[in-house]
Amino acid sequence: SSDLCNLTLYGFPVIMPLYLATTNNGGGAWFKVSQWSQIWGFQFVVTIFGNVFWGRMGDSHGWMRQMRWFGCWFCVIGTLGMYYIPQFFGANMVLMCADAVVLGLGISAFVPMGAVFPALASEHKGAAISAHNLASGLTTFFGPLIATVLISTIGFGGVCWTYAICYAIGSLVTLGIHPHQPGFDDRGHRITAIERN
């Protein structure tokens, strides 16, 4: 599930201007490219505040639980929303911006990933951080690659569903990842004061 958030973060700038602002490959030309840029920029504003919010939430409620339920599933909803909102509601900037909030919160909910890798390999933290950087780079590459390879065969909707399925699979994968997080047991449950004593 490493850095799955990068799939849409780097894949959507490839396909969404075509989908939302042209009629190519089944696009609907609902918005101008400048409007898409505003939607996408708004999503990045949300991630700035989301990074701070989720950093605190992850420390309080568990890194993996946060990424599993909020990171992966908000990204599923936000990804599919970017495709289906124009299909059903046309050029509705309010709904698209609301979806950008969901997607931005989902992407930023992966913020504990930088702590998870070193926690999984506490004896090899340098190598763990290198592996994290490699995973980030690969998903930065695979997001646009998925879009480029699949768009001509399964269209914009198919690409969005592919991303969404990857997020759903990532959610399942997190069930088998158990980093040591201070204040939590190996299953990701908070250790109470009574249990510590």
Model-derived segments and spans:
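A membrane-interface helix-boundary motif in multi-pass transporters
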Residues: A147-Y167
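C-terminal ends and interior cores of transmembrane alpha-helices
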Residues: W73-G90
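Cytoplasmic membrane-interface "Motif A"-like loop-to-helix N-cap segments
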Residues: S60-W73
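Helix-to-loop junctions at the C-terminal end of transmembrane segments
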Residues: G50-W63, I151
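Intracellular juxtamembrane helix-capping segments at the cytosolic ends
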Residues: S108-A121
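Hydrophobic core of transmembrane alpha-helices in multi-pass small-molecule transporters
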Residues: N92-S108
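A late C-terminal transmembrane helix in Major Facilitator Superfamily
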Residues: H124-T153
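Extracytoplasmic gate region of multi-pass secondary transporters
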Residues: S2-W40
